[in-house]
């Protein structure tokens, strides 16, 4: 069994726990690799065990950090490697255990006492080409000039859904429904559902409301303000400016994100975290 370890780089406690996990797994006889960025911030790992995250070819990745760290890992890994998240962030919607549970969780993982939770992702096409990362949380189409609204028209399976003047449009998975989409007025969606949330961001018209559509839906977005650039943001990890005439299409990705889970609990785990968030 082979493991990869990635830690939140700006938190000393996360880096120290990463080394303890690394040492525990090495002493237990497993192959263990550490990503290059973690090594830069804590160069105590054996150099021969250091690899770029993109080159990880392991059975599991232990992610020690918050949701942002998990999203960074998910964007950089090329394979669908199951992730075990140890929470060193604020709320940790995507993580599975707290730091004091880390070694108990590792023991259960080694013993095979776990299950895999698969989450859908979204794929974005720009003028018909997929040149940007898949989204685990959301695809956000945002105004390129703060304080200036954008004029968007979006279609669902070729049919006109709405035309909005707003700060942007968020297209979210159930996983991302507790993030940016919820701040835009979207609902909490049970992560076991295969649906997509579409949420206008601060629209002028109060009739432009969030909606939920099936995951197999094709969503096309057009920028009607032909002189104004827009920003495409994916999971808060990837950003790019788009020319005004860019045709944006969002569909279900063939890839999924896999998480190691030790229980099937959804409630009250998520609802309590939402209460703490707001």
Curated annotation (Swiss-Prot):
Q: Where in the cell is it found?
A: Cytoplasm
Q: Which reaction does it catalyse?
A: NAD(+) + ATP = ADP + NADP(+) + H(+)
What does the entry list under GO cellular component?
cytoplasm
Binding of NAD(+), residues: 67-68, 72, 137-138, 148, 165, 167, 178-183, 202, 237
Keyword list, A-Z: ATP-binding, Cytoplasm, Kinase, NAD, NADP, Nucleotide-binding, Transferase
Q: Which parts form a coiled-coil structure per UniProt? A: none
| Enzyme Commission identifier(s) | 2.7.1.23
Record GO biological process: NAD metabolic process; NADP biosynthetic process
A GO molecular function assigned to this protein is: metal ion binding
Instruction: Note the Gene3D superfamilies from the entry.
Output: Probable inorganic polyphosphate/atp-NAD kinase, domain 1, Probable inorganic polyphosphate/atp-NAD kinase, domain 2
Active-site residues, record numbering mapped to chain: 67 (proton acceptor)
Write down the required cofactor(s).
Answer: a divalent metal cation
User: Which NCBIfam families does the record cross-reference, listed alphabetically?
Assistant: PRK03708.1
The record's function comment reads: Involved in the regulation of the intracellular balance of NAD and NADP, and is a key enzyme in the biosynthesis of NADP. Catalyzes specifically the phosphorylation on 2'-hydroxyl of the adenosine moiety of NAD to yield NADP.
Q: State the family it belongs to.
A: Belongs to the NAD kinase family.
> What name goes with this protein?
NAD kinase
Upper lineage is:
Archaea, Methanobacteriati, Methanobacteriota, Thermococci, Thermococcales
């Amino acid at each position: 069994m082979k493991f990869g370890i990635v830690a939140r780089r700006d938190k000393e406690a996360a880096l120290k726990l990463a080394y303890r996990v690394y040492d525990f797994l090495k002493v237990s006889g497993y192959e263990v690799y550490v990503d290059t960025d973690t090594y830069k911030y804590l160069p105590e790992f054996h150099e021969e065990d250091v690899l770029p995250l993109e080159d990880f070819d392991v059975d599991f990745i232990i992610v020690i950090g918050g949701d942002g760290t998990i999203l960074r890992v998910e964007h950089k890994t090329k394979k669908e490697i199951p992730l075990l998240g140890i929470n060193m962030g604020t709320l940790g919607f995507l993580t599975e255990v707290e730091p004091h549970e880390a070694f108990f969780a590792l023991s259960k993982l080694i013993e095979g006492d776990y299950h895999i939770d698969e989450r859908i992702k979204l794929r974005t096409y720009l003028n018909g080409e997929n040149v940007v990362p898949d989204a685990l949380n959301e695809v956000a189409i945002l105004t390129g000039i703060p304080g200036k609204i954008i004029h968007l028209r979006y279609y669902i399976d070729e049919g006109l859904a709405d035309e909005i003047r707003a700060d942007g449009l968020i297209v979210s998975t159930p996983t991302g429904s507790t993030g940016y989409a919820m701040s835009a007025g979207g609902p909490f969606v049970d992560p076991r559902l295969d649906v997509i949330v579409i949420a206008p961001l601060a629209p002028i018209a109060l009739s432009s409301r969030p909606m939920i559509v099936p995951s197999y839906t094709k969503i096309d977005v057009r920028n009607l303000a032909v002189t104004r650039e827009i920003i495409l943001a994916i999971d808060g990890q990837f950003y790019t400016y788009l020319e005004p005439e860019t045709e944006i299409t969002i569909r279900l990705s063939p890839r999924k994100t896999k998480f190691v889970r030790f229980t099937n609990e959804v409630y009250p785990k998520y609802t309590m975290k939402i209460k703490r968030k707001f």
